[in-house]
UniProtKB/Swiss-Prot annotation:
InterPro entries associated with the record: GPCR_Rhodpsn (IPR000276), GPCR_Rhodpsn_7TM (IPR017452), Olfact_rcpt (IPR000725), Olfactory_Receptors (IPR050427)
Ranges per topology, Cytoplasmic: 43-50, 114-132, 213-228, 283-305
Subcellular location: Cell membrane
Transmembrane segments: 19-42, 51-72, 94-113, 133-151, 189-212, 229-251, 263-282
GO MF term (any one): G protein-coupled receptor activity
Protein name listed in UniProt: Olfactory receptor 4F4
PANTHER family from the UniProt entry: OLFACTORY RECEPTOR (PTHR48002)
Chain ranges on the Extracellular side, renumbered to this chain: 1-18, 73-93, 152-188, 252-262
Keywords: Cell membrane, Disulfide bond, G-protein coupled receptor, Membrane, Olfaction, Receptor, Sensory transduction, Transducer, Transmembrane, Transmembrane helix
UniProt xrefs under SUPFAM superfamilies: Family A G protein-coupled receptor-like
Family: Belongs to the G-protein coupled receptor 1 family.
Disulfide feature: C90-C182
Top-level taxon in the UniProt lineage: Eukaryota
């Protein structure tokens, strides 16, 4: 009976592991700083108390949480001889990954819907995207994330693990773990693709259709409004591609390639949460202005103190 799993990690080279430790330590620091900066800015600046920025702040919290499930252990494991995780710890990682990942999908869809209403039906925006609607969206996001993660965990919790325990990655995820089970997992592989893969692909297609409709609507707007809307949409579409691109290949692609899987796993858990705050702050004038106001307020408070 397997009681622990051994991660093979990203590399066997000690020199490369030292470099990767420094690189990902800086990256994770950037993830924490960037996403917390967005949350603090949105909460503290009344100019950003709108549905779009409410959803953005929640997206930043989920990005930070999603990265924190895997990145800290990956970083500490670079200096470990045996990169080990307990069986229960592995199940917890699977649960949290799909909990935050499922919730993020819903929030990205909600952000697409928010932009659709704001641009295509502006007169109804305040009625549809009211405070209660935003709270309801978050409740649905967490609820779907929970149901999705429980369904994923149900696939793995009763599987017999009696022999191989080496996971060729730096964290536990269902497609990799079920391959170590002492039973035929073909049907289970199909169920995982049907669950995570179909959910990912359908969500991605829905978002692409929504943003296509929005882009077609923008063409008929005045130049000043269309340029601002296009800037915001570019940020949204970039984030959607960064999130769903790796997900489609990890969960929906039936012919996994080990080296590509590791790269996509790093991209999904580290690079995307790092880039999202940069994209939203660099492409959004309101966010940049609010951050400057926050810095001035902080400097003023320090001088006063």
């Amino acid at each position: 009976m397997v009681t622990e799993f051994i991660f093979l990690g990203l590399s066997d080279s000690q020199e490369l592991q030292t470099f990767l430790f420094m690189l990902f330590f800086v990256f994770y620091g950037g993830i924490v700083f960037g996403n917390l900066l967005i949350v603090i800015t949105v909460v503290s600046d009344s100019h950003l108390h709108s549905p779009m920025y409410f959803l953005l702040a929640n997206l930043s919290l989920i990005d930070l949480s999603l990265s924190s499930v895997t990145a800290p252990k990956m970083i500490t494991d670079f200096f470990s001889q045996r990169k080990v995780i307990s069986f229960k710890g592995c199940l917890v990682q699977i649960f949290l990954l799909h909990f935050f990942g499922g919730s993020e999908m819903v929030i990205l869809i909600a952000m697409g819907f928010d932009r659709y209403i704001a641009i295509c039906k502006p007169l109804h925006y305040t009625t549809i995207m009211c405070g209660n609607a935003c709270v309801g969206i978050m409740a649905v996001a967490w609820g779907i994330g929970f149901l999705h993660s429980v369904s994923q965990l149900a696939f793995a919790v009763h599987l017999p693990f009696c022999g191989p325990n080496e996971v060729d990655s730096f964290y536990c995820d269902l497609p990799r773990v079920i391959k170590l089970a002492c039973t035929d997992t073909y049907r289970l592989d199909i169920m995982v693709i049907a669950n995570s893969g179909v959910l990912t692909v359908c969500s991605f297609v829905l978002l692409i259709i929504s943003y296509t409709i929005i882009l077609m609507t923008i063409q008929h707007c005045p130049l000043d409004k269309s340029s601002k809307a296009l800037s915001t949409l570019t940020a949204h579409i970039t984030v959607v591609l960064l999130f769903f691109g790796p997900c489609v290949f990890i969960y929906a692609w039936p012919f996994p390639i080990k080296s590509l899987d590791k790269f996509l796993a790093v991209f999904y858990s580290v690079i995307t949460p790092l880039l999202n705050p940069i994209i939203y702050t660099l492409r959004n004038k309101d966010m940049k202005t609010a951050i400057r106001r926050l810095r001035k307020w902080d400097a003023h408070s320090s001088v006063k103190f």
